[in-house]
Amino acid sequence: DIANRIDEELENKDAKEILKVIGNYSKALDLLDDYDHRTLVKPKGNDSKKRIKYDDCLDIISKLKFNEKSDIFAIEKDRGLEAIIGDIYLTFDGNDVYKSVEEKASNFLYMIVKNHVFVDGNKRIAATMFIYFLNFYDILYKDGKQVIDNNALASLTLMIAESNPKEKEVIIDLIMNFLS
């Protein structure tokens, strides 16, 4: 743990207080360290046989306030969202390709952002669908707190948008770690 290593070297009270605050962010710092060294571990996650439905997703998207600001917001291209929903539930040889709910959720967010399945609003729709997905599977909250806060959701969505597709697996692992 990064904060504990630094703590051994510091003696004064102010430094120890600062490290106490930094210690509250040890999970984030450890994730950054693992990301830098490409040693992120994919958490096991949860299983579920429930499935989100394409029509339910479209219903939620149609009610987004962003629809009022643009004539092209949420116009779907070639039923791309339906294809993504099919992709996250793919099986091979009787086993789910994406094993856990968290892995499905992470890929759902990633694919909506990267595949640009809407004329306008891909990032906003992706973030909304991610929240819906987490809530649908009862993993949006842990111990009464959001597992992904507003800033983290915006940051993850933008990170995906700006990322190189070659980085997909490490980004998926990072998102899954946020959810665990």
Please report, for each region that a protein language model flagged, where it lies by residue.
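FIC/Doc superfamily catalytic core
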Residues: 1-180
